[in-house]
Regions:
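N-terminal cap/lid segment of alpha/beta-hydrolase-fold proteins
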Residues: 24-50
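Alpha/beta-hydrolase active-site loop
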Residues: 94-114
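Active-site-adjacent alpha-helix of alpha/beta-hydrolase-fold enzymes
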Residues: 173-207
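Short glycine-enriched nucleophile-adjacent loop
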Residues: 130-141
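Alpha/beta-hydrolase fold nucleophile elbow
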Residues: 116-127
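Short substrate-entry loop that stabilizes the transition state in hydrolases
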Residues: 51-53, 61-94, 178-181
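C-terminal catalytic histidine-bearing segment of alpha/beta-hydrolase fold enzymes
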Residues: 202-241
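Short beta-strand/loop motif that positions the catalytic acidic residue
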Residues: 165, 171-173
């Protein structure tokens, strides 16, 4: 039989769990948003308390029914770090057409929530989500922080857009993210260096971290929330949001 003491014990365990420097309970809710007639499912995660809080939207990688990264775990980790987190699963199409609109719907939704400080909005993007985060930051001026992890090697990323990105940028990649089945053999490390160079040449505020080789495939470093990189993500977000 579950007792009142058991309930208190569970709450205590939740309240002392710490990730990214913030301790406290968090709440996760399922959301459904409309984007061009597509019903997109997602997870909204909130720290305990009333806010207003800074907010971060996570753009996952992959395409079609294959999801790259860990959307729900990242959402929960953001809340445990003191942010409102939103991870929205984009339309299940492999071509990227329409995916930027999905990303925009996510940011617009989080920005209008009462418990969110609309002046402190950040975006994290992994792989294809990193490409979308780049495109999104180049077209809007209301983002205060941008984290791009293992960005997809794709000619749709326009290096000339670097000058249009106002938000500070954190670029993350693993040393051995140099070609695998997940990237169709493309060299993500080399491409990320080009992204970093474009931002530097444009005079942008950029931090660029290359992590040591991760297992047999550096792209998989960001498949889960791992302390190797997450501590840098939360440090960066807290310094700008």
């Amino acid at each position: 039989m579950k007792t009142h003491f058991d309930s208190l014990k569970c709450l205590l365990l939740l309240s002392i769990f710490t990730l990214g420097g913030w301790s406290g309970t968090s709440i996760a809710d399922k959301v459904t948003l409309d984007s061009g007639g597509h019903k997109l499912k997602g997870t909204l995660c909130r720290p305990g308390g009333t806010g207003p809080f800074p907010a971060v939207v996570y753009h996952h990688g992959g395409g079609g029914n294959a999801i790259g990264g860990s959307p729900e775990d990242t959402c929960r980790a953001l809340a445990k770090a003191g942010f409102i987190g939103l991870s929205l699963i984009r339309r299940s199409t492999k071509p990227l057409q329409g995916h930027l609109e999905d990303a925009e719907v996510a940011v617009d939704y989080i920005k209008q929530r009462d418990e969110v400080d609309s002046g402190r909005i950040g975006v994290i993007g992994f792989s294809r989500g990193g490409l979308l985060a780049w495109q999104q930051a180049a077209r809007r001026n209301d983002l205060a922080a941008l984290v791009i992890m293992g960005v997809a090697v794709n000619r749709q990323l326009n290096f000339a857009d670097a000058g249009n990105i106002a938000a500070p940028v954190l670029l993350l990649v693993s040393k051995n993210d140099t070609g695998s089945r997940y990237t169709k053999g493309r060299n993500t490390l080399k491409f990320t260096r080009r992204v970093a160079d474009a931002l530097k040449q444009a005079g942008r505020d950029i931090e660029f971290i290359v992590y040591p080789s991760f297992r047999n495939d550096g792209h998989t470093l960001f498949f889960e929330v791992r302390s190797e990189y997450w501590k840098d993500v939360t440090r960066f977000l807290k310094s700008h949001l």
